[in-house]
Amino acid sequence: MARKALIEKWNKTPKYSTRAYTRCRICGRPHAVLKKYGICRICFRELAYKGEIPGCKKASW
């Protein structure tokens, strides 16, 4: 319930632009969000393993 409320609060435009912060579009996690994709590292990893992110593959060297 608290996470849903935070997501709703995040969707509103803030009074001042400095109050805006990134949040994962899938799970709502506020930390470790990749700006390019708009999702957190955990969701990114899951989607990358499933092959749902085009052009992304596991690095190996």
Swiss-Prot record:
Zn(2+) binds at residues 24, 27, 40, 43. Its cofactor is Zn(2+). Keywords: Metal-binding, Ribonucleoprotein, Ribosomal protein, RNA-binding, rRNA-binding, Zinc. Binds 1 zinc ion per subunit. GO terms for molecular function: rRNA binding; structural constituent of ribosome; zinc ion binding. GO terms for biological process: translation. It holds the Pfam family Ribosomal_S14. One of its GO terms (cellular component) is cytoplasm. Part of the 30S ribosomal subunit. Contacts proteins S3 and S10. NCBIfam families: PRK08061.1 (NF005974). HAMAP family: Ribosomal_uS14_2_B. Binds 16S rRNA, required for the assembly of 30S particles and may also be responsible for determining the conformation of the 16S rRNA at the A site. Belongs to the universal ribosomal protein uS14 family. Zinc-binding uS14 subfamily. This is Small ribosomal subunit protein uS14.
